[in-house]
Structures are given as C-alpha cells and as structure tokens.
Design a protein with these regions (language model features):
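Active-site hotspot residues in diverse enzymes, especially metal/ion-binding acidic/histidine motifs
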Residues: 1-157
Length: 157
C-alpha cells in the first residue's frame, strides 16, 4: 500500500515529501502548537474534506513518523475509523497505557516505515551509516534500523 501511495503521489527520492502526498490525495495539513503532549497526530474527515494535524512541539522525525502513521490508518483502515471519523494516536486519558499495540496500530507503524523509508529509495544508500541515513530520510535512527532489518535479504543479495 505504501508503494502505491508513493507512485500515485510521484514521490521518487528521499526524504519522502509528505506534503506532496497529502496534496496529491487532497488532504489538508496543519502543525498545531497547543496539542497536549500526549497527542502526536490526528486525521479528521469532515464530509468530503480530510485534514491531518501533528503536534508542532514534537521533533521533526517524530512529526513525520506520526503523520505517516496516521496516513496508514487513513489509507488502510478508513472504513472502520472510530471516534466519529477522527483518529487520534495517544489521546489524552486517565487510563493506563495498553501493554500491547492493536493489530491496526502495528499495521500503521509498518505502513509509516515503508512510506518514509521505501526499499527502492534505501537500496542505493544502504552503504551509508545509520546516522547519515537518518539525516537523509529525515527519520529516527530507530526507523532506519527497522527498515534495514525488514529488508535485509533484498538489500544484501
């Protein structure tokens, strides 16, 4: 699914331009300064209009991953969006955090990694170190490490 979105959005080189993807799919975007620290990102559908918002106080890498994660929910789980057509990751709550992620959350994380560090873009640069790849793709070193691990066979054959 992530590859399809990249092709449809005509994104061909790192760092993946998330604004280009949003624009290609008619999704508005805003960075919000007054989100609670516990809210990373959200997507809202208001009739035919769709808006994505991220917590502006987060690090650039976190904002990018959170937005890509929300896009994963939007593109993969849209029919079952809870909360009156709003999806919020890490919503404010007095409840303790769940010990494990739901399958939908895991899928959205995988989608985000595939969208931000696609194999086709990683392959030509894999000889670079993890810190350099992190800077190139504008993602955390953890996201790069996971991408390399997931694509180990394809990268080193």
């Amino acid at each position: 699914m992530a590859r399809k979105i990249l092709v449809e959005s005509k994104v061909k080189a790192p760092p993946v331009d998330l604004l280009q993807i949003l624009t290609a799919h008619g999704i508005g975007y805003e960075e919000v300064d007054d989100f609670p620290d516990t809210v990373d990102a959200l997507i809202v559908e208001d009739g035919p209009k769709v808006y994505a918002a991220v917590n502006a106080k987060q690090h650039l890498h976190r904002r990018r991953f959170s937005l890509a994660h929300e896009l994963g929910h939007y593109f993969m789980h849209r029919q079952g969006m809870p909360e009156e057509d709003i999806t919020i990751d890490n919503p404010p709550s007095d409840e303790p955090a769940a010990p494990t992620k739901s399958p939908a959350e895991t899928e959205a994380d995988i989608f985000a990694g595939e969208l931000l560090v696609p194999l086709e873009m990683l392959k030509p640069h894999v000889q670079k170190g993890i810190p350099e790849l992190s800077r190139l793709f504008l993602v955390s070193e953890q996201v790069i490490s996971i991408a390399i691990s997931r694509h180990m066979k394809a990268l080193y054959k």
